[in-house]
């Protein structure tokens, strides 16, 4: 819901693909700068507390968005008001950088390792369900009641999440001997470099984030200018991606933990091919079908990538490794900004389609020339 409302609102205000990239970049920079610190924090402090604090911050940000729209400032009548969305994006980036490593690293602390893949898949499926319903609901709420209503609903949902996290079991940090944070971050990098399996998993995971994820923030261009379906159509497109994600989550949750690296690579290829077709499609039905395939590929890669990292990383390094993994979302912001510039310079279809073609090439190379990696469980 938040992504549909925020991206379509800034495109409404500025009518600029570059600004779509800029709003994502505003959150990406804090993630790139602070994620490593967030990983060290996750290894030092109770993860449950960090998660709760992040929900408080998100509640306040969405509340501020809603108020800014309600008083008539964050609207097309005030084209300079885009700074509110960028400021909020920066704050959200800080929150994500400090809390997301804890969100990811807490799973192995409350679930047995042999059930880790299933737990991650079910967790992903839950998020995918909201991605299925949320965007479409957001589109119709915006069309019927305005942007402020969506932002207030998001604020309320995050407030409810604070209550739900109270029921999480309390976990203690794995690391007992505390060192200098800078040294811990350096140790995290050294650990990844010295473990080729973890390094390769992160490399192909970041390739998907950097080259494929920009389509989400550029979706208003396709919905408004190419397919001409408006904000309701954008919500429906994103919901179809959520439907594919749920289908993939159900399948992956039931699969044995075998050749998961191959699943990661094949998921990247599926997502890349679907994005190429979507980028150049002017057919509404074909675009919907491709969004389903994008969702399947995205969740297939995301779930297996997370499970592989958490399976092959020693517990005392997991928070830091997951924080480095979170850097990928910062890189996604850079990729989105670059895609936005490309969209303004050449076209949105060639920006998204071209990046997807690179992802397909990289993944095919790994499938053919890295047999040892594709056999990793």
Regions found by a protein language model. Give the residues of each.
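MFS-fold secondary transporters
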Residues: 11, 64-68, 72, 76, ...
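Juxtamembrane intracellular "pre-TM" segments in multi-pass secondary transporters
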Residues: 170-203
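Helix-loop junctions on the cytosolic side of multi-pass membrane transporters
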Residues: 105, 109, 147, 151, ...
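Helix-loop boundary and gating motifs at the non-cytosolic
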Residues: 1-30, 190-239
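C-terminal transmembrane bundle of multi-pass solute transporters/carriers
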Residues: 33, 44, 48-50, 64, ...
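Short, flexible, glycine-rich and Lys/Arg-enriched loop motifs at helix boundaries
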Residues: 60-88, 233, 332
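Transmembrane alpha-helix termini and helix-breaking/packing motifs in multi-pass membrane transporters
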Residues: 7-13, 66-75, 133-153, 225-226, ...
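Substrate-agnostic recognition of the 12-TM MFS/MFS-like secondary transporter fold
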Residues: 1-6, 25-42, 46-61, 84-143, ...
């Amino acid at each position: 819901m938040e992504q549909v409302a925020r991206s379509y609102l800034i495109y409404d205000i500025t009518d600029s693909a570059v600004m779509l990239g800029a709003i994502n970049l505003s959150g990406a920079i804090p993630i790139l700068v602070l994620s490593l610190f967030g990983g060290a924090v996750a290894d030092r402090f109770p993860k449950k507390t960090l998660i709760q604090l992040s929900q408080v911050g998100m509640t306040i940000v969405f509340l501020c968005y809603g108020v800014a729209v309600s008083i008539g400032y964050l609207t097309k009548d005030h084209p300079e008001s885009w700074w509110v969305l960028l400021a909020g994006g920066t704050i959200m980036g800080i929150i994500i950088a400090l809390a997301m490593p804890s969100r990811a690293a807490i799973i192995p602390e409350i679930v047995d390792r042999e059930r880790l893949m299933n737990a991650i898949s079910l967790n992903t499926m839950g998020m995918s369900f909201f991605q299925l319903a949320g965007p479409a609901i957001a589109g119709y709420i915006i069309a019927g009641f305005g942007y402020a209503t969506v932002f207030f609903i998001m604020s309320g949902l995050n407030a409810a999440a604070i209550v739900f996290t109270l029921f999480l079991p309390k976990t203690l940090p794995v690391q007992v001997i505390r060192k200098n944070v800078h040294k811990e971050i350096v140790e995290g990098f050294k650990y990844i470099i010295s473990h080729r399996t973890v390094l390769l998993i992160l490399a192909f995971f970041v390739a998907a984030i950097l080259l494929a994820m920009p389509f989400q923030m550029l979706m208003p261009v396709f919905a408004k200018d190419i397919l001409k379906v408006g904000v309701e159509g954008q919500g429906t497109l994103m919901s179809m991606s959520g439907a594919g994600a749920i289908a993939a989550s159900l399948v992956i949750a039931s699969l044995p933990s075998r050749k998961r690296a191959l699943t990661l690579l094949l998921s990247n290829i599926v997502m890349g091919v679907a994005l190429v077709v979507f980028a150049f499609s002017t057919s509404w039905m074909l675009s919907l079908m491709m969004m389903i395939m994008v969702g399947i590929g995205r969740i297939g890669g995301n779930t297996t990538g997370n499970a592989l990292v958490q399976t092959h990383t020693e517990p005392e390094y997991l928070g830091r490794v997951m924080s480095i993994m979170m850097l990928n979302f910062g890189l996604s912001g850079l990729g989105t900004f670059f895609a936005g510039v490309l969209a303004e310079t050449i076209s949105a279809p060639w920006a998204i389609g071209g990046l997807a073609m690179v992802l397909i090439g990289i993944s095919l190379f790994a499938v053919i020339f890295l047999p040892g990696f594709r056999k990793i469980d």
